[in-house]
Amino acid sequence: MLYLLTAFSDGGDIFNLFRYLTFRAGAAFFTALIFGFLFGRPLIDFLRRKQGKGQPIRDDGPTTHFAKAGTPTMGGLLILSALVVSTLLWARLDNPYVWIVLLVTVAFGLIGFADDYAKVKKQNTKGVPGRVRFLIGLLIAALAAIAAAWSHPPDLTLQLAMPFFKDALINLGWFFVPFAMVVIVGAANAVNLTDGLDGLAIMPVMIAGTTLGVIAYVVGNFNLTDYLGVHFVPGTGELLIFSSALVGGGLGFLWYNAPPAAVFMGDTGSLALSGALGAIAVCTKHEIVLAIVGGLFVTEALSVIIQVLYFKRTGRRVFLMAPIHHHFEKKGWAEPQIVIRFWIISLILALIGLSTLKLR
């Protein structure tokens, strides 16, 4: 929105700064961060008053989790609000990719909010039926995939870009739409499964968001894409604003979510942020790279799938408990140990994902 002030610039005043993407990205980061610091405590106090007993704790979970009873959930509202406000302030609102990612984020956030609300109201761990959440998520993802395909340049429409290969594209035809739907919905559910320990999900989300923001900036810059041999998607550089706001809002939330957490992000946050990551990957044509950068989320999701399928087939379990972070808890790892080690893994995977820009 503030980009419109460049119309009043004579080229030598402060309004001219708004032309620069990097300046607006930095401003978006600090806007979201300050928003989180300012409104975090009032929101937590409000949620605690309204929710009473807070987020229900699984009876079959690690016994250490019972100490977290009474902690309010829906803290994702803080991240989501900071992200939306900051993006609307600093991004160019005539950019279709900004709106695609922003609307996907808000839509998945609303699904998560409904789920969190149902859990708190019923005081059990079952909120909105999984099938309902899944079908609504598919509808949102389908609309986003079609909008992204419509916005992409003609030579990239319905194409799948392959990392590590220069200018390698696979024409998926209209199969691109269901593929993109799987990317967005899959990302949403994978991050949701990861959000089981204090600070576990938010830092990997911020790391992935930073990585995808850099990729969006590169992919949207003709000179950089020409140098690196990466496909050029005009306009995606503006998603750096969104990614910067995501990281700023995430840090503001982590201030209150650091162990022992004063608030949980809940599905409100995990579904919103993960939907955003999937949407950015689809817009920038880096869907496969998302699987690398978000490898931790993929591992968490696979651990659940393997556990369920193996148990149905044999009546036995592969892991002591799924998702896999609970397996390590059952083995006696301390919660901070699991969280920090998973953060390190996320950082390594992010660096591998970034390397795909050059290794071609």
Curated annotation (Swiss-Prot):
GO molecular function, one term: phospho-N-acetylmuramoyl-pentapeptide-transferase activity
Pathway stated in the Swiss-Prot or TrEMBL entry: Cell wall biogenesis; peptidoglycan biosynthesis
EC category: transferase
Membrane topology, from the record: Multi-pass membrane protein
Reaction equation(s) it catalyzes: UDP-N-acetyl-alpha-D-muramoyl-L-alanyl-gamma-D-glutamyl-meso-2,6-diaminopimeloyl-D-alanyl-D-alanine + di-trans,octa-cis-undecaprenyl phosphate = di-trans,octa-cis-undecaprenyl diphospho-N-acetyl-alpha-D-muramoyl-L-alanyl-D-glutamyl-meso-2,6-diaminopimeloyl-D-alanyl-D-alanine + UMP
Main localisation: membrane
EC annotation from Swiss-Prot or TrEMBL: 2.7.8.13
UniProt cross-references to InterPro entries, sorted A to Z: Glycosyl_transferase_4, PNAcMuramoyl-5peptid_Trfase, PNAcMuramoyl-5peptid_Trfase_CS
Keywords, ordered alphabetically: Cell cycle, Cell division, Cell inner membrane, Cell membrane, Cell shape, Cell wall biogenesis/degradation, Magnesium, Membrane, Metal-binding, Peptidoglycan synthesis, Transferase, Transmembrane, Transmembrane helix
Known cofactor(s): Mg(2+)
Residue stretches spanning the membrane: 27-47, 71-91, 93-113, 134-154, 168-188, 199-219, 239-259, 262-282, 288-308, 337-357
Location(s), subcellular: Cell inner membrane
Gene Ontology BP terms: cell division; cell wall organization; peptidoglycan biosynthetic process; regulation of cell shape
CDD domains attached to this UniProt entry: GT_MraY
Domain of life, per lineage: Bacteria
A matching Pfam family: MraY_sig1
GO cellular component labels: plasma membrane
Family: Belongs to the glycosyltransferase 4 family. MraY subfamily.
HAMAP family reported in the protein's UniProt record: MraY
Its biological purpose: Catalyzes the initial step of the lipid cycle reactions in the biosynthesis of the cell wall peptidoglycan: transfers peptidoglycan precursor phospho-MurNAc-pentapeptide from UDP-MurNAc-pentapeptide onto the lipid carrier undecaprenyl phosphate, yielding undecaprenyl-pyrophosphoryl-MurNAc-pentapeptide, known as lipid I.
Name of the protein in its database record: Phospho-N-acetylmuramoyl-pentapeptide-transferase
Gene: mraY
